[in-house]
């Protein structure tokens, strides 16, 4: 799950070579992006001060396969890690043991999380011609009544069509046949993926359809490219009107969504849906916290992290195993190089991002007395492909501009990785709760041109991560973390 307001600037699958000039910085507001290029002779005191350390990190980081080895252990020996599952418990224990063995101070912090369990799932066209339809229940969906639901299908392609057909929706299963736009490398920020244009139907569709009396929903999988792949994701009942019963929801392949839409154009379609999902009482999980303790400013903290949980399909390699191991290997690389910064770099592996975000909320609450001395919080939650730069910002607008400018200076050290882009954004899901306390929020950005081909599906497996690009991610992250943790002043200071 990603924060929809987040603008993630991406590169083409094969980015063009960079000319030997100052980096391009993208500055974004809510809708308009302005390209600014600094002069080649413009002063960059941060880059000048840390170029030697950055070169050491980049040279060592590009050849370091530690992150990939960690990711292979996590995905191949544990696998997917839904909140409340034994697999997530094992992953937490693995992360603690791994970072303790590397010499870091590690502990866990209790978090109570939702406990949703997938059961048997069935889908089929009943009329006009019987045909089985593969499906995948949406996370947090309620179960169907025992024996399932058999009802007519109503196909909609947007919210207006749902409103216009509200009379037909009563007693029906609504199919949200919403095509995710293809990746557009020329579109700014998160618009390049098309995810933001479609994911709202997955999360809010059931509540809206239930308001008109629907008995269930089907969602076209949120992906632009499919080879009959099913993509799950969180279904939310937050918008459900008082007194309206929750209804079940499932994802179907883009191919089957189009098939059902064509059938419905020819005449009535009846569908059978059966989901045996369970929502059990909340259960105990934990955030993992590991400190690479600083020197003379050790009480000040740079938080870097990813979410250790995943959906219950695939291996959770790109979402978000890659983000976790990038951060774990960042402090390992710096320690190996003997680059101990002035401030403490803290790795946080959050629990329950996918279906509750309770780990993020719990961390911000548990550490509220430290947030005034938390100088930056970074998240990586868009896979393990090539790094392209950083999103950055702060709640205070003036401070946000300063943060973006300084992160851009640091990113200029990453020209050899073609990771110099910087945009101003609101922050990603797990770091966002720290924003109101004034913590600068940063995201490690990646090439996401293929990310949503595998996202939340059985195809999210280790083979989708290239060892070299993952090593480059670690190198980019280590440069940012080290410089910010070692600077004389905070990156948001006037």
Predicted regions mapped to residue ranges:
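Stable alpha-helical elements in mature extracytoplasmic
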Residues: 46, 50-54, 66-71, 78, ...
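Soluble metallo-hydrolase cores and metallopeptidase-like ectodomains found primarily
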Residues: 51-53, 127, 134-136, 140-166, ...
């Amino acid at each position: 799950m990603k924060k929809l307001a987040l603008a993630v600037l991406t590169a083409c699958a094969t980015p063009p070579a960079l000319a030997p000039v100052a980096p391009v910085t993208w500055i974004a507001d809510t809708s308009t992006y302005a390209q600014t290029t600094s002069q080649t002779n413009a002063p960059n005191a941060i880059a000048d001060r840390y170029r030697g350390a950055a070169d050491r990190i980049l040279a060592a980081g590009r050849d370091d396969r530690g992150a990939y080895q960690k990711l292979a252990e996590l995905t191949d020996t544990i696998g997917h890690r839904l909140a409340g599952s034994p697999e997530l418990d094992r992953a937490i224990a693995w992360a603690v043991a791994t970072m303790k063995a590397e010499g870091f101070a590690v502990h866990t912090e209790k978090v109570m999380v939702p406990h949703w369990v997938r059961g048997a799932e069935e889908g089929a066209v009943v009329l006009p011609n019987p045909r089985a339809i593969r499906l995948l229940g949406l996370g947090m969906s309620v179960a169907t009544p025992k024996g399932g639901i058999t009802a007519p299908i109503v196909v909609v392609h947007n919210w207006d069509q749902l409103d216009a057909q509200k009379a037909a929706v009563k007693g029906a299963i609504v199919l949200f046949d919403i095509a995710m736009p293809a990746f557009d490398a020329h579109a700014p920020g998160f618009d390049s993926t098309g995810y933001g244009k479609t994911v709202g139907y997955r999360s809010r569709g059931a509540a809206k359809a239930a308001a008109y009396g629907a008995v269930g929903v089907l969602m076209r999988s949120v992906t632009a490219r499919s080879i009959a792949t099913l993509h799950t994701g969180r279904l939310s009942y937050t918008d459900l009107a008082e007194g309206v019963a929750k209804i079940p929801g499932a994802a179907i392949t883009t191919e089957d969504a189009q098939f059902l839409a064509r059938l419905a154009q020819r005449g009535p379609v009846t569908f059978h849906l059966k989901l045996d999902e369970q929502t059990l009482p909340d259960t105990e999980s934990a955030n993992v916290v590991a400190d690479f303790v600083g020197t003379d400013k050790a009480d000040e903290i740079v938080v870097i992290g990813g979410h250790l949980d995943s959906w219950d399909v695939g291996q959770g390699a790109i979402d978000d195993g890659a983000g976790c191991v990038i951060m774990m290997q960042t402090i390992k690389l710096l320690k190996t190089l003997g680059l101990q910064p002035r401030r403490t770099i803290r790795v946080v592996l959050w629990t329950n991002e996918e279906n509750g975000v309770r780990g993020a909320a719990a961390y911000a609450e548990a550490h509220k007395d430290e947030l005034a001395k938390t100088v930056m919080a970074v998240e990586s939650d868009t896979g393990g492909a090539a790094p392209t730069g950083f999103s950055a910002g702060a709640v205070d607008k003036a401070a946000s501009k300063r943060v973006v400018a300084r992160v851009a200076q640091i990113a200029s050290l990453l020209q050899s990785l073609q990771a110099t882009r910087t945009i101003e954004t609101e922050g990603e899901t797990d770091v966002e709760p720290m924003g109101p306390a004034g913590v600068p929020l940063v995201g490690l950005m990646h090439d996401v041109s293929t990310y949503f081909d595998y996202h939340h599906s059985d195809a999210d497996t280790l083979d989708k991560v290239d060892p070299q690009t993952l090593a480059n991610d670690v190198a980019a992250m280590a440069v940012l973390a080290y410089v910010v943790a070692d600077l004389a002043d905070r990156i948001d200071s006037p």
